[in-house]
Amino acid sequence: MKRHGILRIFPFPFESTPMTLTELLIPTYRQMLQALGVWLRKAEAQVEDADALMAARLAPDMFPLSTQVRFACVQAYEGVHRLRHESMPPALEALLDEGRNGGDHPGTMAEALARVDEALAFLGTLAPDALDAGAGRPLELGLPMGLTFDLDGEGYARDWALSQFYFHLMTAYAILRNQRVELGKADYVQHMFAFLRPATAPAG
């Protein structure tokens, strides 16, 4: 039986093994939402009125930080529910509404951090194969403006779920940098330090 997944390539002499959708998406969602939490906590420590950051935007026609945080969380929830062919729960619809209303009601830094922590807690409950059955299933992706896309689970993960997740995540990062919060590449890829060869770490 063909195993759906994206190939995970190891240097010789290891053999290639397929990476399942769960192995691809859930660690990605978790490590990047953890990073988002770190960015927000750094902003909270550096900026006197951190709550004011929630209303900050990159451009007048873009959603504020408050919305970007919530929509990044939404993408993680939505990816899981769509790939398991589940209806979107009321709590997710409420989070979407909270994000859409971020311009008028940006909320507080503490509330934004709570949304990130809630999403991480949800991801932590998933089984190691939680999404795998959805890899080859047909999936209908409907958008509010009436557009509908027909994909399978793998195409949805590659072409929509990850790109949307990173869009909102990176917009949040860019807003914080634009507001002079001190962040760097190490804050963005902090998960990579788990793989750092000790002898290559900078001295000091």
Predicted regions and their residues:
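Short, Lys/Arg-enriched N-terminal segments with co-localized hydrophobic residues
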Residues: 4-18
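Mature, function-bearing regions of proteins
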Residues: 15, 19, 26-30, 89-92, ...
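Generic N-terminal segment detector
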Residues: 18-52, 60-66
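Generic recognition of stable, solvent-exposed alpha-helical segments in well-folded globular domains
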Residues: 24-35, 71, 114, 167, ...
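Structural signal for well-ordered, non-membrane alpha-helices
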Residues: 33, 37-44, 77-80, 117-124, ...
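Acidic interhelical loop/turn segments
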Residues: 47-55, 124-157, 189
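Conserved alpha-helical segments that form or flank metal/cofactor-binding pockets of metalloenzymes
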Residues: 62-96
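C-terminal or internal capping secondary-structure element at the end of a domain, subdomain, or sheet
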Residues: 154-199
